[in-house]
Amino acid sequence: MDYIQTLFTSVNQVGEKIDSYKSSLNLINPGTCENLSKEVSKDILLSNYAFTGVRADVTKGFCTSPWFTVSHAFALGSQVLPPYSFSTMFGGEPLFLRGSVDNDGAVQAMLNCTWNSNVLSKVQMQLSNGAVPNMCQIEHDHKGKDFSFSFKAMNPWYEEKLTGIYIISLLQSVTPKLSLGVEALWQKPSSSIGPEEATLSYMTRYNAADWIATAHLNGSQGDVTATFWRKLSPKVEAGVECQLSPVGLNHSAALMTGPKPEGLTSVGVKYEFAQSIYRGQVDSKGRVGVYLERRLAPAITLAFSSELDHPNRNAKVGLGLSLELPGSDEMIQQQQQQLAAQTA
């Protein structure tokens, strides 16, 4: 028993020394692996903003505590968005729920549960009778003082000794500015589809005061993605994303035509003004895109999207309008306060 007690005492002492050393480094939480290059890929580049055709969104809020809204979305001439969809959101502590249904009967639902300020669980489901496959996704995120851990399961099922896609990722701060991460993916489809597959990815992030650099390496296919973000002024940001692949950026096409090294570099800029946000982008394939979002009033937002593909002589244009209708005296008062602050 004395040996066991001595062993546990030694382990505790080692753990205390490690914690003391980590505290002396002044490490911070590095964010999540999913948001490794968020400043470039999600905030500046147009992949999350560009659209085609005409769209309109009408949102009505009923209360703010808990938060409850309903929304109607209309789209014309879009190859991605359905002609009509109805969605609703309900949020409070600790739950947040969102659901939508479109004109084809496709249903999407999401549930977020915040256990505490550092632990978050998510469940997403998609049911459709069309070309889009059904999907169920379970996520769990844990943020520590100097690390972030995430687990994700897509379409998990117990048959054939567990099938689905499972992803585990860890991002750890090693200095106040430098973070290193690893992500493991295990995919096991049913025996009628194909064999199982496992991959490892490695990532790093360097966060300086006014610029951020990231790199991501897919260990199995050799794909490399690097980004650089810089804040040029309080209202202007710029970013660069470079993708390199030894087998081609479109892996499904590479299976049919054979591997072909390919690369793509995108440069983007974001201007943020009091009533509008402008995003512009150009890539190495000769495509130029712009996205402009203008708030005409506290409840009315106008969006314009355009892309010119010079080598292929193709152009895409989109125009959108968002209308937010207050549904309570409290929400009307909030909009009036917002308008007064903007005109002051």
UniProtKB/Swiss-Prot annotation:
Topology of the protein relative to the lipid bilayer: Multi-pass membrane protein
Biological-process GO terms, alphabetical: monoatomic ion transport; protein import into mitochondrial matrix; protein insertion into mitochondrial inner membrane
Signal peptide coordinates: none
Subcellular localization, as worded in the UniProt entry: Mitochondrion outer membrane
Keyword Protein transport assigned: yes
Matching Gene3D superfamilies: Porin (2.40.160.10)
Main location: mitochondrion
GO cellular component terms, semicolon-separated: mitochondrial outer membrane translocase complex; mitochondrion; pore complex
Alphabetic keyword roster: Ion transport, Membrane, Mitochondrion, Mitochondrion outer membrane, Porin, Protein transport, Transmembrane, Transmembrane beta strand, Transport
Pfam families: Porin_3
GO molecular function, one term: protein transmembrane transporter activity
Subunit structure: Forms part of the preprotein translocase complex of the outer mitochondrial membrane (TOM complex) which consists of at least 8 different proteins (tom5, tom6, tom7, tom20, tom22, tom37, tom40 and tom70). Interacts with mitochondrial targeting sequences.
Entry's family note: Belongs to the Tom40 family.
Summary of the function given for this chain in its UniProt record: Channel-forming protein essential for import of protein precursors into mitochondria.
Protein name: Probable mitochondrial import receptor subunit tom40
Species of the source: Schizosaccharomyces pombe (strain 972 / ATCC 24843) (Fission yeast)
The encoding gene: tom40
